[in-house]
């Protein structure tokens, strides 16, 4: 009889281990079979539908498509959300109107190529609604969060979720209208937080010129953003020239089209715009830990459309909130007292200029304008062509139907020919509005002004006489000619200033400034500019000032001095330094500015320690702020201003590191549509001057753009432009080499790498190189520059810029260079 071989203990142990391994392999295979349906698919096609419990991920893993149930209800919806972010944020829903109520459902490609959602009984719950004649299609989720249907044969995109929006916009999606084609793409709110079916609020883009964002409740306006002003919506408080706008607006009036798109919030890839079920527009971004609210509207009862009725004014800081515009009274006193302001106000005194007048100019002499500030301008506006501020006033004055006008930076002249609705008074920011009234409405205020002015004048006269007497007594005792107030010399200077149209500039006396600066003590010295030193001072009332001292030996003469006063007195912008006044005593001339605690940009940029206080985000904000200041100078101010000396030391920083362009001694201004001028006296700073200006004296908006490009590259690199000439190459050559090798991403100080986004740095280098192109025509204009910095649109490729190599003993490195062309080189120090 055959006997089985006997296994020893070692064989038994080996056999046991082997069987355990086999068991683990079998278990793993079974487990994979069980959980496989929950893995993300690459795409959806006729043979690979998406079922409940399965998901489709974008290639970068940011977005996910699948089935979800709001608040764990039995209703199933197909949606897109941010992957691995809790709580779940759904950004798009397919079957908003009709949820899946059965336990089984599939999202698949139909026989005609459309994307359809079928329940367990094969009933169609939702579809793209289009037949593409071929089932050789597939659906995939892109990195942008856009679900697309693609033809497998041609590769053509047949359908996009971005063209079928729900309540949310993602970067690169857009709200739009196309009047000829009858298209109007809007955001539509959910009915509630747990019900994605269409709610009562929509966010659309109006076909006005310029357009504005509008939230409707049903068919009625609920909130509006105010007209678009190049980089911002003018009716949103707090969004001024320093605001980094995530929006881009493109409008073609002739074609009847416009789009309102949203770009990424700088470094924050996870961001979105949504319209909530309560009718609020919100912008949110994720910092890796939680969602942060970037913007929200409406936030106040004054934000609600037509809150105070026609010709009413909603005042945010007032209770009750509604008052009538000046010259108007409540239409119904009883309703007004009850807090029902919807009927609004009516004019108290009729205008002399009537709309049915036989002549357009009738009433010009008897109607006046009342000027309001800090307002959200009314709805129902019209763009009055390409008019400057004065022409805007004259156009409205000569048109009997014009009830108000406004000249808005970034827009131009707006006029109102109908009732004024949805006018709001802000605490700060806002625009100016000029309201047409009968002259008698302003006569009372004028009489009050005359009486007040006379009283103030007499008081000042008495004070001056007393002060003059005390000053005379003091000089008699001290035998020192130190008057408290300027007399003959400053009186003469004031007369010289009158024809220069700088009457609004304050005149300081020398004694006051000497006291404020501790007699121009070296300890008060902030820095040295090309035209003289700058001192910190403190007035008697505690106000800190910066004093620019221009002696007879400085390079800035009377013409430049008057030019700086004349220009800055007319310019008002967040990114321009503010002039407080001036002073003259003998050969000395002083300019008094607001004091900016962080001095100039070069103080931080070129200091081995302080440079770490301005990380990449702060540098990017500074770049955009300077660009906005330039946009105001070149396009939005009443006069076109060419700075001609834009450089790092002329960019001052306030306590919030907001940049302000300074030093307008060399600036030139032109009116109307004049874009270019020339001069025989070429002045500026070497390295920053555009070739055509340095060689031929021709300057324009594009020569300032060139200087901005150099400035931008200096901010990125964090090195003085003079350092490169010492090394035998130029800043532009260094930047170009980096662009060719690494697209410029290695230019930023590596110590700041953690705070930067490489793509954003590279984009800024590309913009800088575009700005320093040899031919002015190859450089962007200021509007294009602003768009490049605030959007992620595709940029043109730069050409190799013209640059020269300086030797170490090159005279261009001199701090006091004055050539035969009178080119001046400033000492680069903080001011």
UniProtKB/Swiss-Prot annotation:
UniProt-annotated glycosylation sites, renumbered to this chain: 45, 71, 106, 112, 340, 356, 399, 446
EC number(s) stated in the UniProt entry for this protein: 2.7.11.1
Ranges of residues in domain PAN: 353-439
Modified residues (Phosphoserine): 554, 569, 649, 662, 722, 814
Reactions performed catalytically: L-seryl-[protein] + ATP = O-phospho-L-seryl-[protein] + ADP + H(+); L-threonyl-[protein] + ATP = O-phospho-L-threonyl-[protein] + ADP + H(+)
Record's GO cellular component terms: plasma membrane
Active-site residues, Swiss-Prot/TrEMBL: 645 (proton acceptor)
Segments forming domain Bulb-type lectin: 43-162
Ranges for domain EGF-like: 298-334
Listed GO MF terms: ATP binding; calmodulin binding; carbohydrate binding; protein serine kinase activity; protein serine/threonine kinase activity; ubiquitin protein ligase binding
Annotated S-S bridges: 302-314, 308-322, 392-413, 396-402
Domain of life of the organism encoding this protein: Eukaryota
Binding site for ATP: 526-534, 548
Protein name: G-type lectin S-receptor-like serine/threonine-protein kinase At1g61390
């Amino acid at each position: 009889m055959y006997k089985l071989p006997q296994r020893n203990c070692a064989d038994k142990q080996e056999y046991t281990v082997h069987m355990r391994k086999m068991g683990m392999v079998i278990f793993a295979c079974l487990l994979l079979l069980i959980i496989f349906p929950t893995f993300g698919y690459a795409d959806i096609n006729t043979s690979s539908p998406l079922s409940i419990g399965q998901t489709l991920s974008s290639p970068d893993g940011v977005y996910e498509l699948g089935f979800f149930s709001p608040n764990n209800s039995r209703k199933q919806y197909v949606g897109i959300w941010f992957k691995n972010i809790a709580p779940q944020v759904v950004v798009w829903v397919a079957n908003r109107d009709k949820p899946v109520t059965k336990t089984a459902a599939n999202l698949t490609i139909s026989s005609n190529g459309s994307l359809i959602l079928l329940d367990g009984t094969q009933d169609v719950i939702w579809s793209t609604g289009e037949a593409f004649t071929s089932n050789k299609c597939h659906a995939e989720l892109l990195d942008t969060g856009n679900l697309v249907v693609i033809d497998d044969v041609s590769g053509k995109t047949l359908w996009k979720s971005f063209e079928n929006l729900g309540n949310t916009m993602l970067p690169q999606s857009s709200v739009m209208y196309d009047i000829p084609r009858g298209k109007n793409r809007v955001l539509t709110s959910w009915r509630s937080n747990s019900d994605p079916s269409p709610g009562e609020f929509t966010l659309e883009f109006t076909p006005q010129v310029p357009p504005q964002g509008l939230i409707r409740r049903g068919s009625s306006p609920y909130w509006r953003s105010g007209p678009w002003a190049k980089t911002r919506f003018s009716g949103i408080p707090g969004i001024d020239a320093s605001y980094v706008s995530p929006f881009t607006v493109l409008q073609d009036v002739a074609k009847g089209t416009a789009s309102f798109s949203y770009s990424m919030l700088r470094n924050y890839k996870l961001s979105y715009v949504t319209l909530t079920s309560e009718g609020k527009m919100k912008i949110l971004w994720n910092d890796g830990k939680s969602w942060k609210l970037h913007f929200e509207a409406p936030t106040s009862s004054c934000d609600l459309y037509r809150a105070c009725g026609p010709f009413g004014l909603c005042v945010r800081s007032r209770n009750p909130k509604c008052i009538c515009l000046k010259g108007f009274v409540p239409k119904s006193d009883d309703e007004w007292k009850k807090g029902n302001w919807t009927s609004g106000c009516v004019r108290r005194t009729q205008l002399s200029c009537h709309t049915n007048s036989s002549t357009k100019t009738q009433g010009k002499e008897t109607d006046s304008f009342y000027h309001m500030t800090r307002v959200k301008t009314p709805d129902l506006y019209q763009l009055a062509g390409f008019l400057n501020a004065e022409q805007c006033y004259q156009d409205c004055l000569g048109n009997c139907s014009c009830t108000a006008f406004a000249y808005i930076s970034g827009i131009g002249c707006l006029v109102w020919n109908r009732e004024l609705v949805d006018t709001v008074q802000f605490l700060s920011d806002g625009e100016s509005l000029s309201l047409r009234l009968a002259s008698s409405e302003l006569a009372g205020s004028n009489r009050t002004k005359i009486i007040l002015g006379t009283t103030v004048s007499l008081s000042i006269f008495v004070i001056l006489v007393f002060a003059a007497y005390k000053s005379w007594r003091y000089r008699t005792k001290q035998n020192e000619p130190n008057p408290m107030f300027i007399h003959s010399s400053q009186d003469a200077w004031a007369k010289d200033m009158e024809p220069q149209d700088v009457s609004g500039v304050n005149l300081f006396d020398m004694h006051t400034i000497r006291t404020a600066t501790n007699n121009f003590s070296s300890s008060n010295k902030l820095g040295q500019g090309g035209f003289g030193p700058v001192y910190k001072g403190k007035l008697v009332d505690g106000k800190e000032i910066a004093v620019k001292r221009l002696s007879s030996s400085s390079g800035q003469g009377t013409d430049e001095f008057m030019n700086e006063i004349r220009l800055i007195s007319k310019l008002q912008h967040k990114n321009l330094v503010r002039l407080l006044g001036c002073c003259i005593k003998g050969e000395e001339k002083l300019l008094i500015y607001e004091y900016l605690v962080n001095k100039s940009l070069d103080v931080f940029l070129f200091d081995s320690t302080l440079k770490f206080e301005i990380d990449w985000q702060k540098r990017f904000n500074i770049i955009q702020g300077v660009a906005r200041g330039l946009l105001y100078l070149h396009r939005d101010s009443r006069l076109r201003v060419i700075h001609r000396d834009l450089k790092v030391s002329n960019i001052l920083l306030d306590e919030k590191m907001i940049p302000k362009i300074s030093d307008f001694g060399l600036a030139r201004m032109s009116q109307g549509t004049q874009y270019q001028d020339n001069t025989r006296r070429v002045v500026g700073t070497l390295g920053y001057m555009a070739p055509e200006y340095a060689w031929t004296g021709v300057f324009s908006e594009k020569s300032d753009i060139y200087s901005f490009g150099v400035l931008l590259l200096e901010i990125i690199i964090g090195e003085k432009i003079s350092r490169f000439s010492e090394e035998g190459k130029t800043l532009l050559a260094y930047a170009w080499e980096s662009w060719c090798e690494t697209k410029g991403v290695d230019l930023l100080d590596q110590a700041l790498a953690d705070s930067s986004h490489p793509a954003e740095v590279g984009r800024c280098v590309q913009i800088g190189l575009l700005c320093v192109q040899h031919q002015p025509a190859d450089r962007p204009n200021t509007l294009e520059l602003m768009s490049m910095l605030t959007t992620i649109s595709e940029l043109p490729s730069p050409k190799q810029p013209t640059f020269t190599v300086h030797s170490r003993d090159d005279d261009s490195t001199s701090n006091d260079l004055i050539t035969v062309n009178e080119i001046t080189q400033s000492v680069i120090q903080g001011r």
